[in-house]
């Protein structure tokens, strides 16, 4: 993945995550901050979706799809294109999930896809990945992904 595409995907994932969990730490949520963050996530999502770059490897493509799913999920802006874009992203995900090895990235992508379609086989596959990990030695990222899946 080109560094700029990778950076775009990671920046969108980070911004979407922050928007989704805004106020969960007990801090107050201010409408101007919520509006600004929502607009930024939507702008980043639209820019990445509109980009012709999709990544060259399965992992790169999965990272872009994950970022897009997170962005559309976090933002409540919709100019009528959201459902069509989500369906196109999900269609790309179905092919990627078949070839992506069991990993943190695959768990995160399965979780994001499941959040859109609630298809139980996706959850079953995510549970298999989680059960293959040694729960005593999970990284912070793995722990966070497991929590996101369980929520």
Q: Which residue ranges define each predicted feature?
A:
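A generic tandem-repeat structural signature
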Residues: 81-120
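Flexible helix-coil transition and linker loops at the boundaries of alpha-helical arrays
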Residues: 46-61, 93-106, 132-136, 140
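Helix-turn-helix repeat elements of alpha-solenoid scaffolds
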Residues: 30-46, 79-91, 119-125
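Amphipathic alpha-helical repeat scaffolds of TPR domains
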Residues: 2-30, 54-77, 101-116, 144-148
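Terminal, low-structured helical/coil segments at or just beyond the last alpha-helical repeat
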Residues: 125-151
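Low-complexity, intrinsically disordered regions enriched in charged/polar residues
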Residues: 3-6, 42, 120, 124, ...
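Amphipathic alpha-helices that form helix-helix packing interfaces
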Residues: 9-12, 16, 41-44, 126
């Amino acid at each position: 993945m080109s560094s700029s595409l990778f950076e775009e995907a990671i920046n969108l994932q980070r911004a979407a995550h922050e928007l989704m969990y805004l106020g969960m730490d007990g801090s107050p949520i201010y409408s101007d901050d919520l509006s600004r963050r929502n607009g930024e996530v939507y702008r980043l999502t639209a820019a990445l979706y509109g980009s012709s770059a999709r990544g060259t490897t399965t992992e790169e493509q999965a990272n872009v799809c994950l970022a897009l799913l997170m962005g559309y999920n976090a933002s409540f802006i919709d100019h009528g294109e959201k459902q069509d874009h989500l369906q196109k992203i999900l269609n790309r995900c179905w092919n990627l999930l078949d070839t992506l090895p069991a990993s943190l990235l695959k768990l995160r992508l399965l979780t994001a896809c499941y959040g859109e379609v609630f298809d139980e086989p996706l959850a079953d596959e995510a549970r298999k990945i989680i059960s293959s990990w040694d729960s005593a030695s999970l990284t912070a990222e793995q722990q966070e992904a497991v929590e996101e899946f369980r929520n």
